[in-house]
């Protein structure tokens, strides 16, 4: 049986997690899975912009990672506004909403994040997906790196 590779959208927290003691083990396993070709990876222009002020070692991580760049569009901004209008999250989380909307509109299978407060949170995920369906978009799977890492059978 041939299984299609999952497409992953990595938000900024995943890239920063590579050097964070709390998240590095699972993040590094995920990056190894990506280097091994197990996923199709997408990074938005917004993520790249958010990394502008990051330490060089964090910015350089993307250089060695095969990925495709996608762009935040007006459609993404509009869907992000809908998440806020529907009170899935507050206005302070607009950037998080833009990440989710960008992944949704680009038909990415899974948005991967370490942000448990505003993104990887069952109540929030249900809210985002309710808004997606109400507006004619498909649902999106939202997971932490720990949940998408492929462990070798042993």
Regions picked out by a protein language model, each given a short descriptive name:
Residues 1-5, 13, 21, 48, ...:
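Acidic, PIN/NYN-like endoribonuclease modules and their adjacent C-terminal/linker elements
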Residues 44, 72-73, 143-145:
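Conserved beta-strand termini and adjacent loop/short-helix elements that scaffold enzyme active sites
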Residues 34-35, 96-98, 130, 138-139:
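Short, charged/polar low-complexity linear motifs in solvent-exposed/disordered segments
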Residues 1-43, 49-61, 70, 85-90, ...:
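Short, well-structured N-terminal submotif of metal-dependent ribonuclease cores
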Residues 68-127, 149:
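Active-site neighborhoods of divalent-metal-dependent phosphate/nucleic-acid chemistry enzymes
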């Amino acid at each position: 049986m041939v299984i299609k590779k999952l497409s992953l959208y990595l938000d900024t927290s995943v890239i920063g997690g590579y050097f964070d003691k709390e998240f590095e083990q699972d993040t590094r396993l995920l990056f190894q899975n990506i280097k091994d070709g197990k996923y199709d990876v997408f990074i938005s222009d917004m993520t790249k912009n958010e990394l502008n002020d990051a330490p060089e070692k964090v910015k350089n991580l993307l250089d060695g990672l095969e990925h495709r760049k996608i762009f935040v569009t007006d459609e993404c901004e509009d869907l992000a506004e809908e998440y806020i209008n529907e009170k899935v999250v507050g206005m302070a989380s607009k950037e998080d909403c833009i990440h989710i909307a960008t992944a949704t509109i680009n038909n990415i299978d899974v948005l991967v994040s370490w942000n448990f407060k505003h993104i990887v949170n069952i109540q929030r995920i249900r809210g985002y997906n309710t808004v997606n369906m109400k507006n004619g978009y498909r649902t999106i799977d939202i997971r932490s790196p720990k949940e998408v890492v492929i462990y070798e059978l042993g």
